[in-house]
Amino acid sequence: MEQQQERPREVYRECMRNHAAKLGTYANDGCCEYTPDDGHPAGLLCAACGCHRNFHRKDFLDGRATAAAGGAGGAGVGVAPMLPAPGGGGPPGYMHMAAMGGAVGGGGGVDGGGGSGGRRRTRTKFTEEQKARMLRFAERLGWRMPKREPGRAPGDDEVARFCREIGVNRQVFKVWMHNHKAGGGGGGGGSGGPGAGGGAQTSSSTTRGGGDVGVGLSPAMGGDGEDDEEVRGSEMCM
């Protein structure tokens, strides 16, 4: 009489529960294998992640199941290789951190992020006194950022002192001056030359209805060593 074949033993691998389904993305909890909870043997809950056993990927410890799952059919008893989580490579824990950090906004929880996924650019608002003083100072400079004087320490030139007086960052003042030298702030018409060449040096300029201006500067604008780099991510309120 032939010996009755044993039933393949079932094992439960990584948790496949999607904790970010409401956000329209995929994020698991990083649990790599189902661990029975000895305190609730009949509940079938995982002691590691707290999810029901049905959320974990089921596998069989026999050659046929291994061949079907991983394509490495063997005659003996084997374990199927761990499949990557849907949506990308890497172990489940890495997928969990990537999805929670990118899609949720890095808030450390599903409900803690803003959901936008993008970084908002900063916006600077000026008082009327600041705008008036910057306009007069820019006209006196000829609407062009001057070079630093040789031998002077950084932050000891005329522009740095002016920025400290009015409480404005040097780079912010540079962007504001570039935005207004073409005539937008009334200073380009009176200064002549710099106003005429403003269009050639502007790489992008967008004016919105609320008066916000986002601008990028070409490296040729300033003769200053530190101020020659391209300015990105700055917005001004008129």
Swiss-Prot record:
Residues of the DNA-binding region: 119-188
Zinc finger (ZF-HD dimerization-type) residue numbers: 12-59
InterPro entries reported for this sequence: Homeodomain-like_sf, Homeodomain_ZF_HD, ZF_HD_homeobox_Cys/His_dimer
Its biological purpose: Putative transcription factor.
Domain observations: The homeodomain differs form the typical one by having namely 4 instead of 3 extra amino acids inserted in the loop between helix 1 and helix 2.
Record-linked NCBIfam families: homeo_ZF_HD (TIGR01565), ZF_HD_prot_N (TIGR01566)
Listed name of the protein: Zinc-finger homeodomain protein 11
Classification of source organism: Eukaryota, Viridiplantae, Streptophyta, Embryophyta, Tracheophyta
Gene: ZHD11
